Amino acid sequence: PAGEKAFARLANKTWNKVDNVLPIYDVDLVTLDALQERLGLYRKQHKAGFGGWQMNNIASVPQEVRSVFDLMKRNTQQDWEHIIGRMHRVTEALEGYIQTLEAAREEGKVAPRRQVDIVIEQTAAYYAPGGFFDELAAEVAEAVPSLKDEAAAGAEAAKEGYRRLNSYLVEKLQPVAPSRDAVGRKAYSLHSRSFLGTTIDLDETYAWGVTELESIIARQSEVAEEIEPGASIERAQQLLDEDPARQLH
């Protein structure tokens, strides 16, 4: 929670200084525009109650903590030592995340049940025997055999962090997580802008999506008829799955 508050203060402080920034080169105009857009969006999201308590199966804290290891260099022994060191810090990072989730829970802010369930499944896979961190430790040991024991200890430390998070999600959040996924038009528009970097006409986009989906379904029905006269799309899928010529072994 303290980290989120500090980030919000910094964002507001930076926002108040942006208007006084004078671009020198043309590229600075682009940078300044992007900075204003992202900071402005963040301030709106923060005001709307967005925060680390929200989770999903792709881009939320549980995945970001794990995926940071994918971005770390793997060229020298020092690189591998840094990876081990970071594995030892996973528990600390996730403990802070648990505090954020708990503070939000006390305010009635809990992610939808569907999202909590999938993150429970993902985190269990992270600390399972032979999971991500065990594989990472093995990768370290293969690159620098002398670091094998340290890597194994780091993996166990990281797994413990995810084990604790998983327990918290199961015991505290899952029982009170709302079953409703819908967030409402206002929140959806902010999420949309966050991912797209621009504002779109939601009604027009939705109508376009429905039209495209209907076109796809119509084409699927045509192909299903070609595969077997009178076949439904589901029947055509079954026939294709059962076709030895289309199976990978």
Regions found by a protein language model. Give the residues of each.
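N-terminal maturation segment of proteins
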Residues: 1-249
